[in-house]
Amino acid sequence: FRNPYLRTTSVYQSLAAEGGTEPVFRTSPPEPWRLVRAYRRQALGKPANPGEINATGYFTASCGITIYRGDAYPEKYRGNLFVGDAAGNIVHRRTLQASGVTFRSHRADPDIEFVASSDNFFRPVNFINAPDGTLHVVDMYREVVEGPSWVPEDLKKQGLVDVLGA
């Protein structure tokens, strides 16, 4: 059932023109346990992506990737990708451009996020194109987005994080 004349170079396509790790611009303070965990990972000297060895500044919990299809906001937003980063308390916006049979995306706002909250409880996890043309943000408003297993035991015991149910 496959078209024998269609040559597929890869079944995987990264939309981000900038590559796999692009900085994000969070305004909320990093959680103390993230700072300690990043320091420990750096001290190990193991190769890792920037999101693992830095407490902030890179996507670590991107979610809810949604294309805005409404008409309530200016035309420049229509067809844009909106991406939540629940760990970074941000909503990131990207533009899409056709690239052959697929697309490429680019950061829409240089050096700033579409929404950057200083509230560490703001966890944008999904988006909904509403019937009135607006884009609704689903916020999992809570302190910790990670599961208890992601926080080192000794940090929980020191009181650097309050994980419900941990």
Regions found by a protein language model. Give the residues of each.
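Beta-propeller domains with acidic blade repeats across secreted/periplasmic ectodomains
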Residues: 1-166
